[in-house]
Amino acid sequence: MAHLLVVESWVGSMSRLLPRAIRENGHAFTFLTRDLHHYLRSAPEGTAHPLLGARNVITADTNDIEALLPEVERLHGVLGFDGVVTSCDYYLPSVARIAGRLGLPGPGPQAVENACRKDATRRVLDDAAVPGPRFAVREEWADIARAAREIGYPLVVKPVDLCAGMYVRRVDDETQLAAACRALADFPVNARGQRRTPVVLLEELLDGPEVSVETVSHAGAVQVVGVTDKSVGGAPAFVETGHMFPAALPPGETEAAEQTALAALKALGLTDGVVAHTEIKLTSAGPRVVEVNPRPAGNRITELIRHVTGIDLAAACVDVALGRAPDLRRVDTGLRSAAIGFLVPESSGTLEALDGSGVRDLPGVLEAQLAEPGKAVKAAGSNNEYLGHVMAGDTDGPGARERVEGLLDGLRAGLVIR
């Protein structure tokens, strides 16, 4: 049995998937957080709280890495950790530094920092000639406006240090650019109490569909698990509305996406101890890197992969954090594709009706999780405002996405927000 230190977590699906993987592989974990109530307020309904499985729950200021490192050293001397992980993007750089300080397996701290900072990712990939959009990083308004004119409208405005598509916006002119920058400036501290870097990333708007390449790296070798498709809505925001694994692409496009992702991981130095989720745009000029995330995919993509291949990427994340070779053997699950679709609110108010009765019992449905009436609803501007999801599989081919879209159409017909 190994003992892992888990530093913070998301409160969504990965908050359950990672502890499950630790437990099912016979390991134990200590949970380290600055605010236990953040997790208690988000207790999952109908299941035991995942933190009940922790050997220890310890409070420390996880936002002050310089103070945290000696504290974790002291804990390590008493409790003995074999690996350190997190599922929360905001703490990935800290986890890499902790692993380095304790002599535990993991990627280099600078590699993780560069992947988590979108501006640093752009610079590293540009220096390595890995294809991406034209971009600029600016802080003052006059410089932002000038760079936008040089790149050309329409373009994409991004924060360099947020997640889930927060404040990522398409802008078509300088008026929209100013509004997007004001909104970003009005959010100086993230949801975990960390002060943001006040710079703006401007990127050329790329054409074509978006996919993600899911990989696992161990001992210097990076293995591609597969390519996932993505649908996006909520313009001018970029809200993920669904995914299917595997993506229904011609073999040549799949190979091109995979090779581009591998080049990005190599350039960043993420070739050991990382489960990664690399987003790629398949443009008319070829694949372009959107983002590189040095952690397992969110939005239950890991579960799509498990349903189709039997590969558990949460378990792989645990394995590589312990310095162990992950089990990436495929098994015949009977499914040829699996898809998830999200119910995305287009208006704000209170959820009055959402009839999902019987959805879970329909053929091919793998999961259905829906909000209850009475919930306060906010029109979606990121991946944080979903009203639920439906997941379905197809035993014959790439029909899972079509099945999910049909199920969502039925749910929307009974959706009432006032």
What is each PLM-predicted segment?
Residues 125-126, 148-171, 189-208, 213, ...:
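ATP-grasp fold ATP-binding core
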Residues 286-287:
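Conserved protein kinase catalytic/activation segment
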Residues 138, 168-173, 216-218:
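Short beta-strand-to-turn element immediately C-terminal to the catalytic PLP-Schiff-base lysine
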Residues 1-111, 142, 371-385, 393-418:
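ATP-binding N-terminal substructure of ATP-dependent carboxylate-amine bond-forming enzymes
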Residues 203-270, 282, 293-316, 332, ...:
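ATP-dependent carboxylate/phosphate-activation module, predominantly the ATP-grasp catalytic core
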Residues 131-133, 154-157, 171-207, 240-243, ...:
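Conserved ATP-binding module of the ATP-grasp superfamily
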Residues 101-167, 191:
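A conserved helix-loop-beta module that forms one wall/lid of the active-site cleft
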